[in-house]
Design a protein with these regions (language model features):
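Arg/Lys-rich, positively charged N-terminal/basic patches that mediate binding to nucleic acids
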Residues: 1-35
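Residue-level signal for well-ordered alpha-helical positions
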Residues: 16, 46, 95-96
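Basic/aromatic recognition patch in beta-strand/loop cores that engages polyanionic ligands
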Residues: 38, 48-79
Length: 101
């Protein structure tokens, strides 16, 4: 297991796939899913450039992939835990509040 997706992050991915399929096409939806998957692997390999979300949550890192931000936590001796994949136009802090458990 290279990385772990929380239940809510899995829901984010499903929402992204549905939206992209509806607004664009199946090919675009598959392409975007591949881009996100590649970025998840880069996060797991620690080769993706990421920054700390804030001083209040120093354990939470954020990485941009196209029009989405991936929020995750690197765990000691465990795969990174991806807690959210949110669109750049969303109110991210509001949506992240319930994911810091």
């Amino acid at each position: 297991l290279l990385y772990e997706l929380t239940t809510l992050a899995q829901e984010d991915l499903k929402d992204i796939a549905r939206y992209t399929l509806t607004q664009w096409s199946e090919n675009q939806s598959l392409h975007y899913a591949e881009l996100l998957e590649k970025r998840f692997c880069e996060i797991a390999e620690r080769t993706a450039y990421s920054r700390t979300l804030s001083s209040r949550y120093p354990q939470v890192l954020v990485n941009r992939c196209e029009h989405h931000y991936i929020f995750y936590i690197h765990q000691e001796k465990k795969p990174p835990r991806i807690i959210a994949i949110l669109h750049e136009r969303m109110n991210m802090l509001k949506r992240l509040k319930n994911r810091f458990d």
